[in-house]
UniProtKB/Swiss-Prot annotation:
Signal peptide: none annotated. GO terms for molecular function: structural constituent of ribosome. The gene is rpmG3. It comes from the Bacteria. It comes from Bacillus licheniformis (strain ATCC 14580 / DSM 13 / JCM 2505 / CCUG 7422 / NBRC 12200 / NCIMB 9375 / NCTC 10341 / NRRL NRS-1264 / Gibson 46). This is Large ribosomal subunit protein bL33C. One of its GO terms (cellular component) is ribonucleoprotein complex. Keywords: Ribonucleoprotein, Ribosomal protein. InterPro entries: Ribosomal_bL33, Ribosomal_bL33_CS, Ribosomal_bL33_sf, Ribosomal_zn-bd.
Amino acid sequence: MRVNITLACTECGERNYISTKNKRNNPDRVEFKKYCPRDKKSTLHRETK
């Protein structure tokens, strides 16, 4: 079952990306290194509620 998640920047807290994940394969919160337009660099983005 895939669910929609929001990814927030760990440095500025801005929610920049919307993605989906499979809860069966990834039960924990996911982290991706993505581009943050506010910081103008690639930062770590974590799943938020």
